[in-house]
C-alpha cells in the first residue's frame, strides 16, 4: 500500500467553495478502477492550507467512508507547530487510515536537530505509520539525508516522500536506512528515474488525471521493465511539467474538471483560477498524453 502510484488527491469543491461529497466519491471510484495504490487525503494538492482543522478532519473521514475499504487512505497531518501536528495525527489514531504524510515544518525553518525532534515527537504520540515529506521548494526547509537516517531508526517512521527532484538523494538516503525503509518520489517528472535508482513509487499529482498510466508505469518499473515504463513516462512528461505551470493545485484542478472528474475547478483564496494562458498549456499536455 505504500509503494507504486499513490495519488495526492485534489479536494473537490462546489462553486461556493464547499467540499463536494459527490465529486469526491467520483474521484475515489476512478482511482479504485484504475489501479492507484493508495490515496493521500488533504495534502498540499488537497489544499490543506486553506481548510480549517475541522474541515481537514472531515475530508479525511469522508474519504475513508467513501473508499469503504477499497483503497488505502493516508492522511496529510503536517503542521509547522509540533503540537499541532501531533493533534492532527492523533485525531486519526483509530480512524482506519493506514498512515500519515507529515511535511517538514514550513516558514519557521527549523535546524536539522529541530526537524529530528519534531518528527520524533509526532511518532512517539501515535502508532500510525509515518511518512516523512521533504519539499524545500514549498517549505523553505530541506531535511538532509543524515536526518532522515536518524529518523528511520524510529519504529513507526517507515517512509519518506522526497520531493527535491535531486536524484542523488536516493543514493544518499539508501546508504543510511534499512532495506525495508520506503523511498517515494514527490516529483512526477523524475519519478521513474527515482524508481530505477531504487525508489519504491511516487506520491503523484499527475495520477489525479492519468491514474491508469501512472499505475502501469510504476508496476512496470517494479518489474524491471524500464523500457516499457519509459514509453509511458515520455508520453506523460509534458503533463508532469505543465501541471506546475501555475502553483499546484491550480492546474491539476482545472485538468480534473476538463476530464469530467470534478464539476468545478473552484479553489479558495489566496489560490485563484487558472489563467487562459495556463489553461491552454495544460490542455495541450493533456492532449499529448492522449487524455483529452
Swiss-Prot record:
<keyword id="KW-0704">Schiff base</keyword>
<feature type="binding site">
    <location>
        <position position="203"/>
    </location>
    <ligand>
        <name>pyruvate</name>
    </ligand>
</feature>
<dbReference type="InterPro" id="IPR005263">
    <property type="entry name" value="DapA"/>
</dbReference>
<feature type="binding site">
    <location>
        <position position="45"/>
    </location>
    <ligand>
        <name>pyruvate</name>
    </ligand>
</feature>
<comment type="similarity">
    <text>Belongs to the DapA family.</text>
</comment>
<keyword id="KW-0220">Diaminopimelate biosynthesis</keyword>
<comment type="function">
    <text>Catalyzes the condensation of (S)-aspartate-beta-semialdehyde [(S)-ASA] and pyruvate to 4-hydroxy-tetrahydrodipicolinate (HTPA).</text>
</comment>
<dbReference type="GO" id="GO:0008840">
    <property type="term" value="F:4-hydroxy-tetrahydrodipicolinate synthase activity"/>
</dbReference>
<protein>
    <recommendedName>
        <fullName>4-hydroxy-tetrahydrodipicolinate synthase</fullName>
        <ecNumber>4.3.3.7</ecNumber>
    </recommendedName>
</protein>
<comment type="pathway">
    <text>Amino-acid biosynthesis; L-lysine biosynthesis via DAP pathway; (S)-tetrahydrodipicolinate from L-aspartate: step 3/4.</text>
</comment>
<keyword id="KW-0963">Cytoplasm</keyword>
<keyword id="KW-0456">Lyase</keyword>
<feature type="site" description="Part of a proton relay during catalysis">
    <location>
        <position position="44"/>
    </location>
</feature>
<comment type="subunit">
    <text>Homotetramer; dimer of dimers.</text>
</comment>
<feature type="active site" description="Schiff-base intermediate with substrate">
    <location>
        <position position="161"/>
    </location>
</feature>
<dbReference type="InterPro" id="IPR020624">
    <property type="entry name" value="Schiff_base-form_aldolases_CS"/>
</dbReference>
<dbReference type="InterPro" id="IPR013785">
    <property type="entry name" value="Aldolase_TIM"/>
</dbReference>
<feature type="site" description="Part of a proton relay during catalysis">
    <location>
        <position position="107"/>
    </location>
</feature>
<keyword id="KW-0457">Lysine biosynthesis</keyword>
<dbReference type="InterPro" id="IPR002220">
    <property type="entry name" value="DapA-like"/>
</dbReference>
<feature type="active site" description="Proton donor/acceptor">
    <location>
        <position position="133"/>
    </location>
</feature>
<dbReference type="GO" id="GO:0009089">
    <property type="term" value="P:lysine biosynthetic process via diaminopimelate"/>
</dbReference>
<dbReference type="GO" id="GO:0019877">
    <property type="term" value="P:diaminopimelate biosynthetic process"/>
</dbReference>
<keyword id="KW-0028">Amino-acid biosynthesis</keyword>
<dbReference type="GO" id="GO:0005829">
    <property type="term" value="C:cytosol"/>
</dbReference>
<dbReference type="Pfam" id="PF00701">
    <property type="entry name" value="DHDPS"/>
</dbReference>
<dbReference type="InterPro" id="IPR020625">
    <property type="entry name" value="Schiff_base-form_aldolases_AS"/>
</dbReference>
Amino acid at each position: 500500500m505504500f509503494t507504486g502510484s499513490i495519488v495526492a488527491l485534489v479536494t473537490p469543491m462546489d462553486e461556493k467553495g464547499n467540499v463536494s461529497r459527490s465529486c469526491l466519491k467520483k474521484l475515489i471510484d476512478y482511482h479504485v478502477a484504475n489501479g492507484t495504490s493508495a490515496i493521500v487525503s488533504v495534502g498540499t494538492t488537497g489544499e490543506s492550507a486553506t481548510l480549517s482543522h475541522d474541515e481537514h478532519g472531515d475530508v479525511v473521514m469522508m474519504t475513508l467512508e467513501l473508499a469503504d475499504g477499497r483503497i488505502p487512505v493516508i492522511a496529510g497531518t503536517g503542521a509547522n507547530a509540533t503540537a499541532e501536528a501531533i493533534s492532527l495525527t492523533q485525531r486519526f489514531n483509530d480512524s482506519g487510515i493506514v498512515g500519515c504524510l507529515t511535511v517538514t515544518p514550513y516558514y519557521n525553518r527549523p535546524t536539522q536537530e529541530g526537524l529530528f525532534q519534531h518528527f520524533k515527537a509526532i511518532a512517539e504520540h501515535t502508532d500510525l505509520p509515518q511518512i516523512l515529506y521533504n519539499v524545500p521548494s514549498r517549505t523553505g526547509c530541506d531535511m538532509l539525508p543524515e536526518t532522515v537516517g536518524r529518523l528511520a531508526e524510529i519504529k513507526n517512521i517507515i517512509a519518506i516522500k522526497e520531493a527535491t527532484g535531486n536524484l542523488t538523494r536516493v543514493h544518499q538516503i539508501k546508504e543510511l536506512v534499512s532495506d525495508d525503509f520506503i523511498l517515494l518520489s514527490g516529483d512526477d517528472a523524475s519519478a521513474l528515474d527515482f524508481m530505477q535508482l531504487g525508489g519504491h513509487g511516487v506520491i503523484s499529482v499527475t495520477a489525479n488525471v492519468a491514474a491508469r498510466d501512472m499505475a502501469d508505469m510504476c508496476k512496470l518499473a517494479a518489474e524491471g521493465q524500464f523500457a516499457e515504463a519509459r514509453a509511458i513516462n515520455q508520453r506523460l512528461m509534458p503533463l508532469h511539467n505543465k501541471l506546475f505551470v501555475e502553483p499546484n493545485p491550480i492546474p491539476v484542478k482545472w485538468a480534473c474538471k476538463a476530464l469530467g472528474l470534478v464539476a468545478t475547478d473552484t479553489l479558495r483564496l489566496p489560490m485563484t483560477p487558472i489563467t487562459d494562458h495556463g489553461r491552454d498549456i495544460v490542455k495541450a499536455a493533456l492532449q499529448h498524453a492522449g487524455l483529452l
